[in-house]
Amino acid sequence: MTVLSREARSALDEAIQEARRKAEQGARNALLVLGVDEERKPGYLTAEQAEIRRQLRTECRRLGSFDDLVRSVAYERWHRMLFARFLAENSLLIHPEFRVPVTLDECEEIAREEGRDLWEVAGDYAAEMLPGLFRRDSPVTRVRFAAEDTMALRSILARIPSETFLAEDALGWTYQFWQTDAKREVNASERKVEGYDICAVTQLFTEPYMVQFLLQNTLGAWWLHLHPDSPLRNEWRYYREGVQHDFSAWPESPAELKILDPCCGSGHFLVAAFHMLLAMRREVGEETEAAIRGILTENLHGLELDPRCIQIATFSIALEAWKAGFPTDSYLPVPNL
């Protein structure tokens, strides 16, 4: 399992916090231009902008406040960019018509030809791959940032090294880092923690070695109980010999196993369990595509209060599924989260 070094994680933390501040400022600027905070529609809006404004005001009422809308637009804007780069760096951003991987440079060329924004194109391509994850019909994804605000976000994204996007735990850490400022502000205020603040204050995700230790000594121990000579034992560095387990209530095959993470966060445990289950299913002769399909539909389940965590966990698992060899031209089941 490839994980971020302490230095790389610290650099990512800094970049994500800066991105949130820039994205929220850019979102606020764009929403003010549209007059979303005003009762009367500005006279300079086009018919298309006026319709987007109407939808955004409806979304604002649903979310509860203008600041909530700012946060929502900022989150969607940055994370569509971030997810697209994760896909591109892993050669998994697929052109929907030609079914071949495209780079961000190629997306930019396509965007120029179509008179669109690079990240709009890249986000649409990503949405084609996981239509259940990216909300293309949401008005928050149609907000156009000013050029200088877009460039600020692109600059931050470009500073993140390519190696970061190849680490299996990188995507999971991004949301905890996204919440850092909000958590700090709530803790400093000493106000009652409720509503939106609950997610910001209570999310603290598990270190990779803890995840590996817990899974290798439960899921791994079960597998070695069934298959004492399994070569997978050599891959589990945290497995402890000689510990007594009672697996009498456990199933006899991976297909019957169900794993539920009741506080799944951004998917650290589920991603690690995915890789262990894939190795187990392959060991008993399953083909990669069938094994992955089975893991997503039969094995992995997760619960989480924060829908943004669910989005990131879903994307994390999907990304690992594609990296493991699931065909990008086949329908990938959405995990049970």
Predicted regions and their residues:
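Short, solvent-exposed loop/turn segments at the edges of secondary structure
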Residues: I295-L296, L332
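Conserved adenine-binding aromatic site and its adjacent loop/helix in ATP-hydrolyzing domains
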Residues: F315, L319
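S-adenosyl-L-methionine
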Residues: E320-L337
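Short, charged/polar low-complexity linear motifs in solvent-exposed/disordered segments
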Residues: S230-P231, T288, T328-S330
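Preference for the N-terminal adenyl/adenosyl cofactor-binding alpha/beta module
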Residues: M1-L278, N299, L303-I312, P335
